[in-house]
From Swiss-Prot:
It comes from Saccharomyces cerevisiae (strain ATCC 204508 / S288c). The keyword Chaperone applies. The keyword Mitochondrion applies. Pfam families: Cpn60_TCP1. The lineage of its organism: Eukaryota, Fungi, Dikarya, Ascomycota, Saccharomycotina. The gene is HSP60. GO terms for molecular function: ATP binding; ATP hydrolysis activity; ATP-dependent protein folding chaperone; DNA replication origin binding; protein-folding chaperone binding; single-stranded DNA binding; unfolded protein binding. Keywords: ATP-binding, Chaperone, Mitochondrion, Nucleotide-binding, Phosphoprotein, Stress response, Transit peptide. GO terms for biological process: 'de novo' protein folding; chaperone-mediated protein complex assembly; mitochondrial genome maintenance; mitochondrial unfolded protein response; mitochondrion organization; protein folding; protein import into mitochondrial intermembrane space; protein maturation. Residues 1-25 form a transit peptide. This is Heat shock protein 60, mitochondrial. May participate in assembly and/or disassembly of proteins imported into the mitochondrion. HSP60 are ATPases and have affinity for unfolded proteins.
Amino acid sequence: MLRSSVVRSRATLRPLLRRAYSSHKELKFGVEGRASLLKGVETLAEAVAATLGPKGRNVLIEQPFGPPKITKDGVTVAKSIVLKDKFENMGAKLLQEVASKTNEAAGDGTTSATVLGRAIFTESVKNVAAGCNPMDLRRGSQVAVEKVIEFLSANKKEITTSEEIAQVATISANGDSHVGKLLASAMEKVGKEGVITIREGRTLEDELEVTEGMRFDRGFISPYFITDPKSSKVEFEKPLLLLSEKKISSIQDILPALEISNQSRRPLLIIAEDVDGEALAACILNKLRGQVKVCAVKAPGFGDNRKNTIGDIAVLTGGTVFTEELDLKPEQCTIENLGSCDSITVTKEDTVILNGSGPKEAIQERIEQIKGSIDITTTNSYEKEKLQERLAKLSGGVAVIRVGGASEVEVGEKKDRYDDALNATRAAVEEGILPGGGTALVKASRVLDEVVVDNFDQKLGVDIIRKAITRPAKQIIENAGEEGSVIIGKLIDEYGDDFAKGYDASKSEYTDMLATGIIDPFKVVRSGLVDASGVASLLATTEVAIVDAPEPPAAAGAGGMPGGMPGMPGMM
């Protein structure tokens, strides 16, 4: 059944591919092309910018199934937008890429990055239309961005206390202090480097629990396995686990496990040295067709360390490792050979297994065995380090925050905010914090007076960045119903020397942003600025835009009788 599905899908794909490659193109040059791209950028940025700041608005998004989604998350709004005009849509897609890259690098700051991208591209297009050299504009922009990041790096503050962690999380969760406190509490329980996962709960209240689990540094083999496009994660409840020491290439090796997964209506996680060829194709096909929820992950480590780690996973989940030493092959798999757990989360970089179903006695015995090996190993520091890593993974806890709410829509919106807050908090712990609300970028605009460039066009590139980096703060203020230009002017002219002095849009007052807990992670600000300036200045250097031309309408009716006879289908 699975093999015939593969054959049918190839046959279905061929005409689609032929049509895609044979399509003729439509071109726009120079000013006309950039104007269309700019219109798409403006449309997307307008929708995303509405969500920025403590008084930002919600966005309602139609879903293919179920109720509409309510969100204030910039990257979710950006990804949902598809424009009818293909040239405009191309501009929107490039700005979506800014939001996605920032989300991937820092996990937050996507709305600010989108606002920055629009501001840089808009000003660049104006200057190019006035006759400036686009390459010199780009060079000037790059020099300015480097200077701004250097200034911010010199003025950032390291984060140390639980209160500061809660403040970062609160700001990222759109001012929800409950989210901030719960995340700070989770970090306190499992440590700053500990594993924290966000799940949808089944009660009205949010809950925090520390549970048994393991994380290892290997992510999904293919992005086609992703189940949650917003967070780019694979999330399975009550999955089965197929564990193999060797590479899996043949479809015969995974057919029994796929059949068991299909019959039991449970997702399947495959952990092996590698999964490729027919086996990987079959997994992806089954996932895309909705027949079996499946994900493949490479086993962590190398050599003996990989062998031991996959053995630890087997003990934790109650599964069997398929290995040549025991003459066990995956094609002989039965449900008794498969491990299981409460849930798994797989990202591009790592995998978290929660509450494995292995017997507690076996897990404890394995822990004692590793402890004994650590005591014996006195000379080889590398081996000892690997043993300690294995011990930490088997015996360490995982903090699980279960998000509650009165409806599916409410839970989904809150989960988005928890995800953003967790990412922002990790970024703050990693690289430090800055005054929030766009304040740090506003203050950084003053250092651009010192930038030395080669010519006038490059100076205009610096001016573009000087103007653009005040836009996020201005947008936050305008979303709160205030006059952005006046307040930004006062922050630069009167409070320019006070790095932490900013404007609290929620209370409509000037304040010390660090003291009041309005802060942004340095990593989020840095990633947003670099990604926005990179894509926007490249867009400005575009001279030709090419899209697939619309398909001509199919001819209807018989020859000589346009449209066919009334009430009768056209003859082919």
